[in-house]
């Protein structure tokens, strides 16, 4: 039985990328390549992703847009608070985390950004409901701050407001970026279009739970956070058409992967619709839909590291991360990327070529 410690590794802190590169496709790409001799790792630039794709493949992107979900403010008593909006419930109401010396009570008001008051509603552990006096999204975008991940240590600036969004972000609602998509730009899309690689889009609003640590050693006891996703009939048809011509389904990011596998049917088709997913993918999971994955490097002991280990094989991921650390790749949200293909169930524990 795998435990939390099986997904731990030592990462030099200087390898945690603190800012994005000026050129999106200038990040590095670690591609895992398999042949009869084992697994090998290619050190490339992200623009070289085209060398690992084929005409007829379908790239599936998450088009969620990060909202300015963080606020600082105070209670009527003067006590300081920090608010992180987790989810938009309706035009005027949100779910939010509140950091305060004492939890606010229902019916009280909070002053946010020294600009407007919100009313505290019923609590839904671990969140509070907050009622905004005007359309919440408008006030969030006007007065909020971009919610950079906790391991990025600078105050967000105008550069972050551009680079912590994908170029195709269009559906507001996330509090963390689908970071594998940060590496794509219009020039790369033009090259992919020219070679016959297709694009599809879904929406999964990434919640702050993506950064929540796993607190139990027995990972089977972990309970995943829930996130909202939507899959269009157009994407479901694109999946069907791709399969019909022998193309591969390539998930861009773990959020796309989670949405696709949540909506995948036993026959390999995709069900259109929307809903909540708390899917927890760990080694032993049998993937129904996704053939390849573009992803960043993930935190030790994280559910996302478990997901990529389930997909590519635990030993492959361990070897890939050792290689990446030795080669000084940049890690986490603003870091470099990997290209992985799905391991067959009977090869997920196979050892990669030790010479890599």
Swiss-Prot record:
List the catalysed reactions. Answer: 7-aminomethyl-7-carbaguanosine(34) in tRNA + S-adenosyl-L-methionine = epoxyqueuosine(34) in tRNA + adenine + L-methionine + 2 H(+)
Q: Which GO terms describe its cellular component?
A: cytoplasm
* Pathway where it operates: tRNA modification; tRNA-queuosine biosynthesis
An annotated Gene Ontology molecular function: S-adenosylmethionine:tRNA ribosyltransferase-isomerase activity
- In terms of superkingdom, the source organism counts as Bacteria
- Predominant localisation class: cytoplasm
> Could you tell me which SUPFAM superfamilies the record lists for this protein?
QueA-like (SSF111337)
Task: List locations, semicolon-separated.
Answer: Cytoplasm
One BP annotation, GO: tRNA wobble guanine modification
For this protein, the record's PANTHER family field holds: S-ADENOSYLMETHIONINE:TRNA RIBOSYLTRANSFERASE-ISOMERASE
Q: Which NCBIfam families match?
A: PRK00147.1, queA
Instruction: Share what the entry says about its subunit structure, partners included.
Output: Monomer.
Q: What does this protein do?
A: Transfers and isomerizes the ribose moiety from AdoMet to the 7-aminomethyl group of 7-deazaguanine (preQ1-tRNA) to give epoxyqueuosine (oQ-tRNA).
Family that this chain belongs to = Belongs to the QueA family.
By what name is this protein known? S-adenosylmethionine:tRNA ribosyltransferase-isomerase
Species of origin: Ralstonia nicotianae (strain ATCC BAA-1114 / GMI1000)
């Amino acid at each position: 039985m795998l435990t939390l410690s099986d997904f731990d590794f030592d990462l030099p802190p200087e390898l945690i990328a603190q800012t994005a590169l000026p050129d999106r496709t200038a990040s590095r790409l670690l591609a895992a390549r398999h042949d009869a001799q084992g697994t090998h790792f290619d050190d490339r630039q992200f623009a070289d992703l085209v060398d690992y794709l084929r005409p007829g493949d379908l790239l599936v992107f998450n088009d969620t847009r990060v909202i300015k979900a963080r606020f600082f403010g105070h209670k009527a008593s003067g006590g300081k608070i920090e608010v992180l909006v987790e989810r938009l419930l309706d035009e005027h109401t949100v779910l939010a985390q509140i950091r305060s010396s004492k939890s606010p009570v229902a019916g009280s008001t909070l002053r946010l950004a020294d600009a407007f008051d919100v009313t505290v509603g019923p609590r839904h552990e671990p969140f509070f409901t907050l009622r905004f006096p005007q359309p919440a999204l408008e006030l969030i975008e006007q007065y909020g701050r971009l919610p950079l991940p906790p391991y990025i240590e600078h105050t967000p600036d105008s550069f972050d407001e551009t680079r912590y969004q994908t170029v195709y972000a269009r559906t507001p609602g996330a509090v963390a970026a689908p970071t594998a998509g940060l590496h794509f730009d219009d020039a790369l899309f033009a090259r992919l279009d020219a070679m016959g690689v297709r694009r599809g889009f879904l929406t999964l609003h990434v919640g702050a739970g993506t950064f929540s640590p796993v607190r139990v050693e027995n990972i089977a006891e972990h309970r995943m956070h829930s996130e909202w996703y939507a899959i269009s009939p157009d994407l479901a048809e694109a999946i069907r058409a791709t399969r019909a011509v022998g193309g591969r389904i390539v998930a861009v990011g773990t959020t796309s992967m989670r949405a696709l596998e949540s909506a995948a049917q036993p026959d390999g088709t995709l069900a259109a619709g929307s809903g909540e997913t708390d899917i927890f993918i760990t080694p032993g999971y049998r993937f129904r839909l996704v053939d390849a994955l573009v992803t960043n490097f993930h935190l030790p002991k994280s559910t996302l590291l478990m997901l990529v280990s389930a997909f590519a094989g635990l030993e492959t991921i361990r070897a890939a991360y050792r290689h990446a650390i030795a080669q000084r790749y940049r890690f986490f949200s603003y870091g470099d990327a990997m290209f992985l293909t799905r391991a067959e169930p009977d090869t997920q524990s196979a050892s990669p070529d030790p010479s890599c």
